[in-house]
């Protein structure tokens, strides 16, 4: 009798093994269409990846904390414990990375005619860690994260986070570069005078000016729509002034202030 294993036919569901064989395909992990945050072999240029999939990093840059020969490190600061109103900016770094995936495939940036990623070695450094259950130590943790990156002579691009994170970042930058010129886009001045140094997203630029981290005479605050009796020496372009000025004229004035 014929053994069951030797039968072929529509009723048995058995098909010759040769018909089941799928040709093997070699996939080079460095040219795979996804997860360039982990697999890209160059710090320069772009490599198209589906905007809807793959591991997210800023502009699909490589995830790494190795900063040798790196021009720019992008670091997230998921902190919003200083806000006095609606929280949620702790999700900012993740959201910016997700949005950046929609721009990471363009060979040339509209209006520029070139792509800065062709000339700059940019990496995603990941997020600065701090214990959310110990908020008093968060400013020091943010400062140390920034300090360690700057110590390698790498430029730091930070993703917040509420406004307060600017203060420990300014501390780290001023320690390395000296007094800074600040260009600040906001609806509020964040220079409310308060002598105690509590964690607050409305006082950090007051403290930065008082401590010599920034030079108000070489700093501009742009788009303010709330009143503050004291400007503390900052150059202010309020919202009506910004609406009246052409963007190129505003940029020229800010450049002159910064020097």
Labelled PLM ranges:
Residues 1-2, 30:
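N-terminal acidic, proline/glycine-rich, low-complexity intrinsically disordered segments
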Residues 31-259:
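Conserved alpha-helical scaffold segments that buttress catalytic/binding sites
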